């Protein structure tokens, strides 16, 4: 309907197809979820947000990548070949120093996570997943 794009890209680039669109869609969906639901008295803001979300479908790769990562890190004790492969496939570069591995997302030092070389308890993988999810997704 509009002649100009609704949004323009900034300087950040997609690390994988549709990544930035997913971040924008997620922010819009969160806002939409927080709006009051009034069946008999619709909200213009809710209608606009829903319309934008409907017009901008995406593959939802973030959810797939998070599920793969959560599966791989379940019960983490040490960096196995399966975990290493999953981390690399998701976009992490793995370097080791001392008692930790350093995970750098798409070789961008702004997005690093430290991973113990040996997990201290069964929650280690869950905690690592939560930290990665917070920093990356």
Task: State each model region's role.
Residues 1-90:
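Extended, charged coiled-coil scaffold/tether segments in eukaryotic proteins
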Residues 55-137:
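Long mid-to-C-terminal scaffolding/interaction modules that assemble large complexes
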């Amino acid at each position: 309907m509009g002649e100009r794009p609704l949004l323009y890209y900034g300087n950040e680039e997609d690390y994988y197809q549709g990544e930035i669109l997913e971040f924008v869609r997620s922010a819009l969906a969160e806002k939409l979820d927080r709006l009051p639901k009034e069946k008999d008295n619709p909200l213009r803001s809710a209608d606009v947000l829903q319309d934008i979300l409907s017009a901008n479908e995406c593959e939802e790769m973030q959810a797939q990548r998070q599920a793969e990562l959560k599966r791989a890190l379940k019960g983490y004790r040490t960096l196995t070949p399966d975990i290493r492969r999953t981390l690399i496939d998701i976009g992490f570069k793995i370097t080791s120093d001392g008692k930790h591995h350093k995970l750098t997302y798409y070789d961008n030092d702004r997005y690093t996570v430290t991973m113990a070389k040996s997990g201290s308890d069964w929650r280690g993988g869950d905690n690592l997943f939560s930290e990665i999810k917070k920093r990356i997704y």
